[in-house]
Structure formats: structure tokens, C-alpha cells
């Protein structure tokens, strides 16, 4: 059994944990004896890839039989909510080898993307199987739609002071609006690991704030470089950090199941399902104010906003094929706005869409002179 993957799960959770974990431990030890990925010759590269692939296939075998049992053990039979970034590491403790530990992920985070063995792929397999189960998947979505633990204190501070500085995001009042400012100014307000928590907490505060009637998402003023003195809406994912391996896999799930989904569906309540038919949620109209450009994931956010205001000089792009990433649900949402063919051109062939154009106005509800953005928000 040490060198061979179990061909099937027995159905006994404890027995299968023991058998599969033993196999994954053995595989990890064999991989550790090989040179680091950049130093492998063709033979050792092929061996490493075959070991990883066999281990991943074994994870699917285990999870197809035990995903719900595992999820129920991690959530006390779905009586408690566990956010996805905790869930995967608690699963690593309960079923050794199924997914990487925090130490293993941290070790790979020190490498460039091209140098990694891809231990986080195993987190993807786990999340895939949890989300594929309707009951587990909906429960996990519910957990990610709840306000973050930090948001209660942040809301109190915002209501006391009228402003909130979260570092890479800020919340301000502008008339009847709570304005969430993306403030990763060094990187043109792109999104990365440093911005994620601040942005989601800021969104929670905007939605929960009873003194405001709408929430506005806007980019902060860039202090230097080509766009110095101008507001930039969102440059998408921080490609510099992506290249250097600083964007973890979980970042994508946390962003899209948290911040973006909260804009789209509102905040969940712990005692009521957040579905659109029989459930309930705390919602607020979201307005995006597009200045200069909305690139990649920034453009994707526009598709989840309720109303988009854009400057006449602004543009949108969604170069997902070039980046190797489909931002959130953009491949499904964009075609609802502009049709299938134009969506393909944007995603696959980097078509640039001017906000002040026939196609741009299919996404942007109101296009105004750049100096009129503030007045349009407060109108």
C-alpha cells in the first residue's frame, strides 16, 4: 500500500483516512527526495509529475466518497460556519495529506510561480468537491456571505468618525453614499493579497451602514507615474505579485465568494439562507465609478455592480486569456451585457472597450465628463 494509490474508497471514513493518508505521506516523501522543480531533468520532471497526478487522482477518489462526511465533521454537521481559508487547513489536520498544511503553502509562497510544484492545486480539488455537493456548497457560500469578524468593530469606528482607513482600502461618506475606495496606489489600485481583507471589510461596512442609502466603489488617486494625480478604478490582479508567486490560490475563491458575491447578493444572516426565493439578505445598491480604466478583475466587478458611472475617457479590458485567468464569473456575465461574440473578443483577444462607445454603454449606465463624476455620485 505504501507505494500504490488506493484504487477505491472502502466507505469507512476512518479506515480510508488511514489508507489514503499513508499513501499521500509516501508520495510526499518521494517528491522531497527529488531535486527542486527548476533543477529537474526530463526524467525526474516526468517522475514528479506522475507522482503528483496519481496523488491528485487519489484525492478525487477519496472525496467523491467522503466529501460530505468530511465537511460535516469540519462544520459540526453544518451547524457552524467556517470560512474557506480556515476550512482547508482544518481539513489538512483532519485528513493528513489530503491538502497542504499552512507550512507547506508558506514554503511554496517563497517561490516564483514557475518554480512551484503546485501544492495549492490540492486545495482546489477539495473546494471543487465541497462546492459540487449542493448542501455543502450552499452552506459554504452562506459562510462566505456573512460579515467578517473584523467588520463589527470597523463599522462602529466608521459610524463614530465618518471615515475608515483600512490601509489598502478606505471608506468615506459622500452625501447619501458610503464610498469604498480601493487604495493600492503603488500598483494602480490593483488587487492582491494585501488588499483582500481590507476590501471585503470595507464592503461589509458599506452594506451595514444605516446612514447611507447606496454604496459606491471607486479607485483612489494615484500619486506618481503615468497616471499621477488621476483616479484609477481598478487595474485587476496585481500581475507583478502573480508572477512572483505571491497570489495564493485561495485568494481567488475568497475574493469571488466574499467581496464580489457580497456586492452581487448582499450580506447573509446566520439564521436564514441567503437565497433569492425563500431566504433573506442585507442588500444595498452598489454603484461603480469608473475613472481611467477597469482592467481584468476590475472590469469583472462592473458586471456585478447595480449601476455603473464612467468618465468619457475611461476604458475597459478583460484580457483573461493573456493572464491565464477568467476573472470570477466574467465569462458568463459579460455575454449577458454585450453578447457572446463580443464577450469572446474581450476575453480571448483583448478587445479594448471604450466606456463612451456603443458597446461600452451596454455595460456603463451613465457616461459623463470626468470632472462630473463626483456630482453624478451625489446626485
Q: Where are the language model's segments positioned?
A:
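A structural preference for short, pocket-lining loop segments at secondary-structure junctions
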Residues: 180-182, 198-282, 286-287, 311-315
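Eukaryotic intrinsically disordered, low-complexity, charge-rich
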Residues: 79-151
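Glycine-rich beta-to-alpha active-site loop
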Residues: 52, 56, 86-114, 260-323
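N-terminal, non-catalytic alpha-helical interaction modules of very large eukaryotic scaffold proteins
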Residues: 2-37, 51-52, 59, 66
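Conserved CoA-thioester-binding segment of acyl-CoA-metabolizing enzymes
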Residues: 122-221, 227
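N-terminal intrinsically disordered, low-complexity regulatory domains
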Residues: 43-89
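C-terminal long alpha-helix characteristic of the crotonase
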Residues: 21-44, 48-51, 311-314, 364-379
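Crotonase-fold acyl-CoA enzyme core
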Residues: 274-379
Amino acid at each position: 500500500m505504501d507505494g500504490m494509490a488506493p484504487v477505491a474508497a472502502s466507505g469507512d471514513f476512518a479506515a480510508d483516512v488511514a489508507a489514503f493518508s499513508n499513501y499521500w505521506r509516501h508520495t510526499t516523501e518521494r517528491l522531497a527526495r527529488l531535486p527542486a522543480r527548476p533543477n529537474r531533468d526530463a526524467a525526474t520532471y516526468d517522475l514528479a509529475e506522475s507522482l503528483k497526478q496519481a496523488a491528485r487522482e487519489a484525492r478525487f477518489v477519496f472525496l467523491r466518497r467522503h466529501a460530505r462526511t468530511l465537511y460535516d465533521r469540519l462544520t459540526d454537521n453544518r451547524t457552524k460556519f467556517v470560512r474557506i481559508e480556515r476550512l482547508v487547513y482544518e481539513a489538512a489536520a483532519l485528513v493528513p495529506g489530503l491538502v497542504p498544511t499552512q507550512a507547506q503553502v508558506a514554503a511554496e509562497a517563497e517561490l516564483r510561480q514557475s518554480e512551484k510544484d503546485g501544492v495549492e492545486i490540492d486545495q482546489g480539488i477539495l473546494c471543487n468537491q465541497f462546492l459540487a455537493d449542493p448542501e455543502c456548497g450552499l452552506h459554504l457560500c452562506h459562510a462566505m456571505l456573512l460579515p467578517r469578524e473584523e467588520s463589527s468593530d470597523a463599522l462602529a469606528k466608521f459610524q463614530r468618525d465618518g471615515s475608515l482607513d483600512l490601509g489598502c482600502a478606505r471608506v468615506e461618506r459622500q452625501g447619501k453614499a458610503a464610498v469604498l475606495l480601493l487604495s493600492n496606489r503603488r500598483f494602480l489600485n490593483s488587487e492582491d493579497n494585501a488588499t483582500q481583507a481590507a476590501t471585503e471589510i470595507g464592503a461589509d461596512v458599506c452594506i451595514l451602514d444605516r446612514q447611507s442609502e447606496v454604496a459606491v466603489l471607486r479607485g483612489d488617486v494615484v500619486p506618481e507615474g503615468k497616471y499621477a494625480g488621476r483616479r484609477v478604478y481598478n487595474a485587476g490582479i496585481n500581475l507583478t505579485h502573480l508572477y512572483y508567486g505571491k497570489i495564493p490560490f485561495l485568494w481567488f475563491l475568497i475574493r469571488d465568494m466574499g467581496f464580489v458575491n457580497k456586492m452581487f447578493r448582499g450580506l447573509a444572516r446566520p439564521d436564514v439562507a441567503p437565497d433569492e426565493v425563500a431566504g433573506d439578505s442585507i442588500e444595498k445598491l452598489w454603484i461603480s465609478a469608473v475613472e481611467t480604466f477597469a482592467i481584468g478583475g476590475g472590469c469583472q466587478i462592473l458586471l456585478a455592480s447595480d449601476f455603473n458611472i464612467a468618465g468619457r475617457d475611461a476604458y475597459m479590458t478583460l484580457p483573461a486569456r493573456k493572464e491565464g485567468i477568467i476573472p470570477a464569473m466574467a465569462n458568463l456575465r459579460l455575454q449577458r451585457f454585450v453578447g457572446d461574440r463580443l464577450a469572446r473578443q474581450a476575453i480571448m483577444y483583448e478587445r479594448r472597450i471604450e466606456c463612451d462607445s456603443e458597446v461600452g454603454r451596454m455595460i456603463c449606465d451613465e457616461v459623463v465628463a470626468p470632472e462630473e463624476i463626483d456630482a453624478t455620485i451625489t446626485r
